[in-house]
């Protein structure tokens, strides 16, 4: 089996995705995150597989950079990062509950949950 890859096609695909973005929606999402962060709310992010890595990366950058750039604290957590907790919920309850159970324990009204999915197919 031969893997066919073209840098040119890869770049074209990324340009197509970028051009399809709804800029107003993206700006609205950024503003929501900023408002929650600067009002002291918790922001939790989660995802499965590669999306879990993306979620972790967002929180890493936000926790570090918000403080370094503004001097303000950022209260962010990635629900995918605690492997022991994720697998405990998966084993004792169901994989469907690995994030919802953490949300019950960590988030309060008006906090923010961001779910990341590259495929859109995850049911949890």
Model-derived features with residue positions:
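Generic N-terminal amphipathic, Lys/Arg-enriched alpha-helix
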Residues: 1-21
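Hydrophobic packing residues in well-ordered alpha-helices of helical domains and bundles
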Residues: 7, 26-29, 55
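A short, well-structured juxtamembrane/interface segment
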Residues: 21-39
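Charged catalytic carboxylate motif
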Residues: 13, 25-28, 124
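Glycine-rich, small/polar surface segments that engage phosphate groups of diverse ligands
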Residues: 35-107
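C-terminal binding/interaction regions
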Residues: 109-123
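Residue-level recognition of alpha-helical structural elements
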Residues: 3, 22-26, 51
């Amino acid at each position: 089996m031969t893997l066919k890859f073209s840098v040119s096609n890869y770049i074209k695909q990324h340009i197509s995705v970028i051009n399809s973005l709804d800029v107003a929606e993206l700006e609205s999402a950024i503003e929501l995150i900023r408002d929650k962060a600067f009002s002291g709310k918790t922001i939790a992010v989660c995802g499965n597989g590669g999306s879990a890595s993306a979620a972790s990366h967002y929180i890493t950058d936000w926790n570090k950079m918000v403080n370094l750039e503004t001097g303000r604290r950022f209260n962010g957590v990635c629900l995918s990062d605690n492997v022991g907790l994720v697998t405990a919920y998966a084993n004792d309850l169901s994989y469907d509950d690995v994030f919802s159970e953490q949300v019950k324990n960590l988030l309060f009204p008006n906090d923010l949950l961001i779910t990341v999915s590259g495929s859109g197919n995850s049911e949890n």
